[in-house]
Amino acid sequence: MNIEQFQSMLEEKGITLSSRQLEQFEIYFETLVEWNEKMNLTAITEKEEVYLKHFFDSITAAFYYDFSKPFSICDVGAGAGFPSIPLKICFPHLKVTIVDSLQKRINFLNHLAQKLELSDVAFCHDRAETFGKKEGVREAYDIVMARAVARLSVLSELCLPLVKVGGTFIAMKGAAAKEEIENGKYALEVLGGDLKEMSTFQLPFEESERNILLIEKKRKTPKKYPRKPGTPNKLPIEK
């Protein structure tokens, strides 16, 4: 996906990028590739691939959810900033918090935010399991997002405790999402979530399947969740 295709395919979806926003994506790409030489941020480094599989793929969430309001967003395990930083570039009014367990990725994000001149961003070096217990962030976010972090039964325990009641958990998935939903239904129920919508589409050019799940937080999450680091993965909430 070249820059012209990136721009026009977003425009088709009602997202018009200014020259400054296009410049920010260019700086993002350059910074990602530069830092990737010193540390492993991504296996995808070819420009057209980065624009398609990282930038465009992240922004597809906005095709199914309206980001026009100044929502507070927590992005769990964002790695090199996906999906929340591409969304922040497109919708500068969003208030973004990223939680990642690796300090070196947090260092990269702090550097990136300076280069992109982003405001209203915070980067927290923490495990989602401990972050979700903290006062002030637990059940505090309008939206919590994660892209390809873990299967839904595990991911729900990391993300739903952070969503305020009435807010939305957006899970961005590849193929086989239907099977994940089957296995994850019980966890959603236990943690106070309700699957509202699942949108399936193909990522352009490579035609790989993507699924975006919109999960509404209906009830408070029981205090015992999330459990201690590593437990959600070892013993997922499944029947």
UniProtKB/Swiss-Prot annotation:
List UniProt keywords, sorted A-Z: Cytoplasm, Methyltransferase, rRNA processing, S-adenosyl-L-methionine, Transferase
Q: Which residues form the signal peptide?
A: none
Major enzyme class: transferase
Molecular function terms, GO-annotated: rRNA (guanine-N7-)-methyltransferase activity
* CC annotations in GO: cytosol
* Record EC number: 2.1.1.-
**InterPro entries from the UniProt entry:** rRNA_ssu_MeTfrase_G, SAM-dependent_MTases_sf
Give the superkingdom in one word. Bacteria
Q: For binding S-adenosyl-L-methionine, which residues are annotated in this chain's numbering?
A: G77, F82, A128, E129, R147
What subcellular compartments does it reside in? Cytoplasm
What's the stated role of this polypeptide? Specifically methylates the N7 position of guanine in position 535 of 16S rRNA.
Which NCBIfam families does the entry mention? rsmG_gidB (TIGR00138)
Give the family, as the similarity comment puts it: Belongs to the methyltransferase superfamily. RNA methyltransferase RsmG family.
Q: What is this protein called?
A: Ribosomal RNA small subunit methyltransferase G
